[in-house]
């Protein structure tokens, strides 16, 4: 069970990082 929670946590962190990079790239393109 702990492994599944850890896996979901890693996926969530990776998704947040990906969204953050995407937002930064969009902001750079808008400038």
From Swiss-Prot:
<keyword id="KW-0793">Thylakoid</keyword>
<keyword id="KW-0249">Electron transport</keyword>
<comment type="subunit">
    <text>The 4 large subunits of the cytochrome b6-f complex are cytochrome b6, subunit IV (17 kDa polypeptide, PetD), cytochrome f and the Rieske protein, while the 4 small subunits are PetG, PetL, PetM and PetN. The complex functions as a dimer.</text>
</comment>
<dbReference type="GO" id="GO:0009512">
    <property type="term" value="C:cytochrome b6f complex"/>
</dbReference>
<comment type="similarity">
    <text>Belongs to the PetL family.</text>
</comment>
<keyword id="KW-0813">Transport</keyword>
<dbReference type="GO" id="GO:0045158">
    <property type="term" value="F:electron transporter, transferring electrons within cytochrome b6/f complex of photosystem II activity"/>
</dbReference>
<keyword id="KW-0602">Photosynthesis</keyword>
<keyword id="KW-0812">Transmembrane</keyword>
<dbReference type="GO" id="GO:0015979">
    <property type="term" value="P:photosynthesis"/>
</dbReference>
<dbReference type="InterPro" id="IPR007802">
    <property type="entry name" value="Cyt_b6/f_cplx_su6"/>
</dbReference>
<comment type="function">
    <text>Component of the cytochrome b6-f complex, which mediates electron transfer between photosystem II (PSII) and photosystem I (PSI), cyclic electron flow around PSI, and state transitions. PetL is important for photoautotrophic growth as well as for electron transfer efficiency and stability of the cytochrome b6-f complex.</text>
</comment>
<keyword id="KW-0150">Chloroplast</keyword>
<keyword id="KW-0472">Membrane</keyword>
<keyword id="KW-0934">Plastid</keyword>
<feature type="transmembrane region" description="Helical">
    <location>
        <begin position="4"/>
        <end position="24"/>
    </location>
</feature>
<protein>
    <recommendedName>
        <fullName>Cytochrome b6-f complex subunit 6</fullName>
    </recommendedName>
</protein>
<dbReference type="GO" id="GO:0009535">
    <property type="term" value="C:chloroplast thylakoid membrane"/>
</dbReference>
<keyword id="KW-1133">Transmembrane helix</keyword>
């Amino acid at each position: 069970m702990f492994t599944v929670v850890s896996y979901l946590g890693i996926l969530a962190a990776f998704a947040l990082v990906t969204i953050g990079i995407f937002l930064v790239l969009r902001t750079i393109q808008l400038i």
